[in-house]
Amino acid sequence: MEFGLTRQEASIYQCLLVEGKVTGYEVAKLTGISRSNAYNSLANMTEKGASYLVEEGTTRKYVPVPLEEFCKNRIRRLEESKKWLVSHEPTEKTYLEGYITIEGANHILDKMRNLLSQVEKRVYITCTRNYLLLLVRELEELMESKKKVVIITDQPATFENAKVYVGENRGMQIGIIADSKYVLTGEYGEGSMNTCLYSGQKNFVELYKTALSNEIKLLSIREENKNV
């Protein structure tokens, strides 16, 4: 389904990859899908570039587009669509007003990664150490490009060129402040509500930034006292 195929079409595509050249009747028999649905799906798959139609006399058979080729074609089209969308994108406001609710673990993780990849100068991130492991690539890219990275977590973590503070158990709470303009905060992970709030509303950003700054001050004092 990630590549534009329905669940039924994906099942038929898998059948074609295994069996090779088959008729619609054979596909229906092998997959347990009704003949009418099988023929409709095969026609759709041909349009989507997942199968080829082969006519042998009066018999119509189908063969799969090789998996590697199919994937490359889909990715190429997505890249082309992305270029078109970017070139026709309307100018957005510098600051995002209002509040957006993001639900679902995958959507939240996508937002975290995208937010980090768009950082221009600095980012503050607070979460449990296990969640940091999901963001290693994005964090390393920020540090390599000399962006300021401040991390508040609950267990020791080593990141070169980043300031790491170790505080209380973060649980399922996450928070990101990007360039003092955007905030993502809420619950993420198995067993949580998997709901986050995303906003560029200036007052909200300042409040959240102040809260993190106060926590950092307390953790710094605690760290200094340990070294005395």
Task: Identify the function of each model-found stretch.
Residues 10-20:
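Short amphipathic alpha-helical interface segments
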Residues 68-142, 150:
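PLD-like (HKD) phosphodiesterase/transphosphatidyltransferase domain
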Residues 1-8, 23, 39, 52-76:
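Short, cationic-aromatic polyanion-contact patches
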Residues 133, 140-228:
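C-terminal regulatory/effector modules of DNA-binding transcriptional regulators
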Residues 26-31:
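A short acidic, leucine-rich amphipathic alpha-helix
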Residues 49:
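Glycine-centered, phosphate/nucleic-acid-interacting loop/turn motifs that mediate DNA/RNA or nucleotide
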